[in-house]
Amino acid sequence: MKPGCSLFLLLFSAMLSSPPALAVEPLATTTAPYLLAGAPTFDLSISQFRENFNTQNPKLTLNEFRAIDSSRDKANLTRAASKINENLYASTALERGTLKIKSMQITWLPIQGPEQKAAKAKALEYMAAVIRTVAPLLTKEQSQKKLQKLLTSGKNKRYYAETEGAIRYVVADNGEKGLTFAVEPIKLALSENLDGSN
């Protein structure tokens, strides 16, 4: 018998006699917190948010949000988006039925050329305005500083989150593909370490 045939038969018989290989399941993708069952909502419907935003920021208006067909999570939420301009969008995840906000996002798609600086400045204005809408005690200057701190911490990170009070701030920096800034409510819980003494 030829050496090549012997090797083939040896490998073939070893393959048949060994236990079957089990498929390794890929690592679970992290689910965005607002997609989880029971995720909290802001106490604002999308219409109320838009009205508040536009009243507080007359030079930065949000157009009406349109529902987006998303079969992935239809049972839990409704997705909607509003085009601000060619490279800037607002999107939201809403609780099904109440249309209360689970996540409010501003996405900037970078453009090349001389208009890039102005386009980014406009995107940052919208992002800071979203912060002020959900945290109304912040001044314009404070919201801009907060945004800069978050963007610096989240630079070149696909996901960066920071919580303050009952709000989670999220930055998704995909470099040349775009930048998304989001605000999401979180559930606050009492510490279990309280000893009961007042």
Q: What do the PLM-derived regions correspond to, one by one?
A:
Residues 1-8:
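Bacterial N-terminal signal peptides that target proteins for export
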Residues 93-152:
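Long, charged/polar, surface-exposed segments that mediate recognition or autoinhibition
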